Amino acid sequence: MSAPEPKITPELIASHGLKPDEYQRILDLIGREPTFTELGIFSAMWNEHCSYKSSRIHLKGLPTKAPWVLQGPGENAGVIDIGDNQAVVFKMESHNHPSYIEPYQGATTGVGGILRDVFTMGARPIACLNALSFGDPSHPKTRHLVSGVVAGVGGYGNSFGVPTVGGQTRFHTRYDGNILVNAMAVGLADADKIFLAAASGVGMPIVYLGSKTGRDGMGGATMASAEFDEGSDEKRPTVQVGDPFAEKLLLEACLEIMAKDCVIAIQDMGAAGLTCSAVEMGAKGDLGVELDLDAVPTRETGMTAYEMMLSESQERMLMVLKPEKEKEAEEIFKKWGLDFAIVGYTTPTKRFVVKHGGQVKADLPIKELGDEAPLYDRPWVESERLPVIHARDINAPMGAAEALEKLLATPDLCSKRWVWEQYDHVIGGNTVQRPGGDAAVVRIEDGPKGLALTVDVTPRYCEADPFEGGKQAVAEAYRNITAVGGKPLAITDNLNFGNPERPEIMGQLVGCLKGISEACIALDSPIVSGNVSLYNETSGRGILPTPSIGGVGVLDDFTKSATLAFKAEGEAILLIGETKGWLGQSVYLREICGREEGAPPPVDLAVEKRHGDVVRGMIHAGTATAVHDVSDGGLLVAIAEMAIAGNIGASLDAPPGETVSHAWWFGEDQARYVVTVKEADLLAVKTKLKTIGVPCTQIGVTGGHALKIEGERTVDLKALRHAHEHWLPDYMGGKN
């Protein structure tokens, strides 16, 4: 005999993340008090994580279409056509709240979830990336969180067998109580064999595949839609537990079953587990779904309908199967040692019916649960415009050489080798460019084509000016892909913000989205997938607005990709782009001058596109021997990174006479690249750039084992490398 269900009280409703007006909407919708299981289902489907109820109205303005886009937002992942019947499937998603509570398992299941999103579409994953944001290094939890998250990302990806090829890691006190773990996965599929989530046909069997259901992850989606408080550590049981080896089996079984033409629709069980996957399949197909939970494979005894519907146990799929393929599909899954159970059928009723122990535990309208969930147009206010800081009003406390050494040893600009060396970035044998450059390059099967992959955002810009910050995030991803020779094609986004019920936070989201949209249109890079993570606050203190951008580009010939390392001595160093010496919101201003203020650098998207086209053309023509975009830290940091990577020094000219020296070296003006050119090609390159009106300044020549800056002291490469490489290992070892 089953235990009596809890009485529905205001406290129980609030604990499920539902507001009083939302509960009233439920009463009006179904005409009665919901059962406990139904309350849990509404809680899961109407939270921010699943319904996007605060952001959906603004997401509609994003550009999502292009001739090469096969599938835009709304499915498990986006899909773009790269020719030769090849498609790239990719998406980025957050696992922020779980990773703060239990960093290892939170990170592992973040990676596992995004991999499932990709192979659910019929693609074999070929690469992962990530964007990690941690609190101030001096915070007592930061070192523990870094260690756990990095180990979790590496542990899952390495075991599953997909290379982690790139990413971004930052530190700021605003992430002290809410770290961000954004995971991106990229896969390859046949362009004519993409699998979607919408069910079709009445009476079709709904099949549960993969691992058994347990009580881990209970309420995970609801937790991800609420602020943290001092009792957040008590939510540890809501963090899922991942098994990469089971996921690898699930991948192979799914791809095999897809190749046998058994599948009508497929959906992974991610946030809200069985509830969300079943509702989405039915709602997208304008069908009803009836589930019999007695058939669900479980690994714990006595599980209730509520627990089974809201469990977020990992490595599970839901599939609508062609009836005549049932036996064949079951044999495939049994061969891989995975559970296969028919747990329901599609119906014509457009109702979501859940049965357990011979009783109906839920009977709800499926469309209102899914794609007709509540939609809010929350009030928002535009962020205050910050004043422009003029370079001449900023005193340089030290020389450029000393500032460079200090900057290279700061948490944000230091080498992240300690992080990415814990990831297997070459498994599969297709990684052409490893982490540490502007973008990763991955070979596509046995042909000449390659993919350029990157993740980027500058949160301090987004806080200072959300519109410009949103533009810059897309432009930076565009530059990263361009700098290796790739043609940018599309992006995925992961929008991490604070509490949307505060108008100033909602204003940040709206502003960033406007900037992202404008940049995507100007740079011809539609958004094909994404994720929104709100309520990233602890005790009322929000994170920096962090709209992570994952970019994908294609190279027709990966052997002609560029890297940032200096290649030879005696090559000319060119700066492409205009330098006005913009120090507002720069790393130099923060780390050297101790000030976080001012307007961020403006982004001229037409200039970004023009300069990107020029640099890409130089790479393809073979005239650019090394390329690096100028971003955090400015020009001198970019040159130092190129010198360290190539183990070749440089002699640099003094800044132009009219320029403030520290603004020339450390300003973060946009749309700039450092390019090296052989002496034999120099005149032709400079002549061509002058003819087409692209600013180009020769700033030095490669050579030697030091950076020699005219008017400054010489800095040995060994000293620069030590500064760059040692901060993070020393920090993680407790030495600083």
From Swiss-Prot:
Give the annotated active site: 49, 95 (proton acceptor)
Q: From what superkingdom does this record's organism come? A: Bacteria
| Enzyme Commission code | 6.3.5.3
Question: Which amino acid positions bind ATP, per UniProt?
Answer: 52, 91, 493, 530
User: Which residues of the sequence carry a binding annotation for Mg(2+) 1?
Assistant: 93, 531
Q: Where in the cell is it found?
A: Cytoplasm
Tell me which positions the record assigns to the signal sequence. none
Q: Using the UniProt record, name the top-level EC class of this enzyme in a single word.
A: ligase
Q: Which GO terms describe its cellular component?
A: cytoplasm
| CDD domains (alphabetical) | PurL_repeat1, PurL_repeat2
Residues annotated as binding substrate: 94-97, 116, 240, 312-314, 533
Q: Which residues are Mg(2+) 2-binding? A: 117, 268
Reactions accelerated catalytically: N(2)-formyl-N(1)-(5-phospho-beta-D-ribosyl)glycinamide + L-glutamine + ATP + H2O = 2-formamido-N(1)-(5-O-phospho-beta-D-ribosyl)acetamidine + L-glutamate + ADP + phosphate + H(+)
Give GO BP annotations, semicolon-separated: 'de novo' IMP biosynthetic process
- GO MF entry, a single one: ATP binding
Family matches, as InterPro entries: PRibForGlyAmidine_synth_PurL, PurL_linker, PurM-like_C_dom, PurM-like_C_sf, PurM-like_N, PurM-like_N_sf
Q: Which family is this sequence assigned to?
A: Belongs to the FGAMS family.
Q: Share what the entry says about its subunit structure, partners included.
A: Monomer. Part of the FGAM synthase complex composed of 1 PurL, 1 PurQ and 2 PurS subunits.
Protein name listed in UniProt? Phosphoribosylformylglycinamidine synthase subunit PurL
Organism from which the protein derives = Rhodopseudomonas palustris (strain ATCC BAA-98 / CGA009)
Gene name for this UniProt entry: purL
